[in-house]
Amino acid sequence: MAVSKKSRKSEPSAAFTAADGLVLDQSEIMRAMLAAQKGKQKEESEGNDESDEEDDDVSNEGEDEGESSGSEAESSVAAQRNLKRRRSLSFELDAEGEEDKENEESEPRPQPSSGAGMLSRTALATKDMTPKPRSKPQPNGLPSASKPSADVTFESLGLSRPLITALASINIKKPTEIQAACVEPILSGRDCIGGAKTGSGKTMAFALPIVERIARDPFGVWAVVLTPTRELAYQLSEQFLVIGKPLGLTTATIVGGMDMMKQAQELEARPHIIVATPGRLCDLLRSGGVGPGKLSRVRTLVLDEADRMLTPSFAPELAYLFSQIPAKRQTCLFTATVSEAIMELANKEPPAGKQRPFVYRVASDTLTVSNLKQKYLFIPSQIRDPYLLYILQNPLEDIDVALRVDPKKAKAREREAALGKKGKKPKQAKEEEDAPSVPSTVIFTQRCATAHLLHLLLNSLDIPSVPLHSHLTQPQRLLSLARFRAHEVPVLVTTDVGSRGLDIPEVAMVINWDCPRRSDDYVHRVGRTARAGRGGVAVTIITERDTELVKIIEDEVNVRLEELKLDEDKVLEGLNKVSLARRMATMEMHDSGFGERQATNKAKQIKRMKRDAAAAGKA
């Protein structure tokens, strides 16, 4: 149904409208955001006594690592006091803005004074760890199309031969369930809401039909893909480039932290696909750096990681972008965790004469893949360092044999075998080559300071690692990801900025240094391993502060974490070495002025806000 000129004039961004008349109403999206905001305000009013630790506050690092004093009884009381609040927080997402500020909650809690001596190692095991009976995680009333046939092929979905050939070149020969369900409806122009586990091929589910439609009728800017993080934006651009380059498609990646003039020039060149974070794209459009009408012919809008995008913090940018993109367009939402905002959109009765968007969610009893082995390690917070070192230097038996050796060495042997090199190597050299090395590992922390400190700590212990957090410049962040992907270093230490959407092949293990505060954060973190049918291991370190929290995560995700038992005597043999390395890493962080730039920017922001408030008061 065409949008009348009168209604378009009075409400320039009144609706998401697909090519065949399907509508995702923008007003409903905004209502969902406001509902989420009210829930967040209620949470804040209930928990005013909680304090958020700033990422750039290095001086609080010792407190975060559990070095403050207190009684075990006080710790237990604090845990019980916060339990009710945490239960309501389990599925709520914090918005991540354009500058990728991690606003993770890290609650200061009293700690036992004697460390290991004050903690019973059987305390967690004696608790009732059996998950409560839980229905399938599919939200009640969420409409979903029927499961596609197992015989579906890319050709039967309507993709052209050149695109199928491009997929074969990257070893994609058969569509996954989410791809088989969503490619055809998106290809026909329908709006779509798709949900599936991490590593199930959601990106290709919307990328393939977009590329196919552009190849049939290429002109100007056809599609805009919005993501919550910069790293995910670059990854999506790479995937569009791989499948679209043989067809002559062009893309532009528009994110913060990079040269705005260069990005403005890229937009002036009218790429077929724009992959962007909302803040930077809005800045370019508002500043006049891009000529008017550059987005006037956009036909498809995609919100990737839609549960994070449909939060109040992104509402102003999305509202502005809606007004710049034609009202008559196709809209696609994809996510691994279905939030209340998405459920509202899926269940909303469409306007008269309209249909609901096509909705498909991969049904499952759990929110994590079956080939992922999930374990917990229950230890005092003060001795996490030696346990981390031991796990990295002694790969777990659950890790696939193929991932327990250096990927570079394995690939070198494959090349030699392909070339027919059969020369025998000395026995000692062969044993050294086959000896288990540090597996490809992603370590997640709550705070930027913790991530950077662990990175320095591991490097001083001769375990090469790279950091990924918002205190790094964008080129530094891209370099860290590139080195980890190329297997130059075996360990990536990151905050939750690296938990969403990043597809890093051959990650053998994920370690949660800090227990996630929400179950959906847990799902996205552990989803960095066991992708595309591969195996993987996730180890969550649980301290005396997290015993109730892990039970909530088990209930929400519908899994039972298996206890990881290690020889404590062997682990603590490296305690002195690790303690010395931590002191050296702490001094190096202090000398480097870590977080000073962020502290200066924050002070300027506070000063500017006070000045604006004073000016508003005078007016």
Swiss-Prot record:
Instruction: List the PANTHER family hit by this protein, alphabetically.
Output: ATP-DEPENDENT RNA HELICASE, ATP-DEPENDENT RNA HELICASE RHLE-RELATED
Question: Is Oxidoreductase there in the keyword field?
Answer: no
Q: Where is this motif: DEAD box?
A: 304-307
Q: Which reaction does it catalyse?
A: ATP + H2O = ADP + phosphate + H(+)
Protein name as catalogued? ATP-dependent RNA helicase DBP8
> What does the comment on domains in this protein's record state?
The Q motif is unique to and characteristic of the DEAD box family of RNA helicases and controls ATP binding and hydrolysis.
Species for this entry = Cryptococcus neoformans var. neoformans serotype D (strain B-3501A) (Filobasidiella neoformans)
Family classification: Belongs to the DEAD box helicase family. DDX49/DBP8 subfamily.
One GO CC term on file: cytosol
Tell me which residues make up the Helicase C-terminal domain.
430-572
One of the entry's Gene Ontology molecular-function terms is: RNA binding
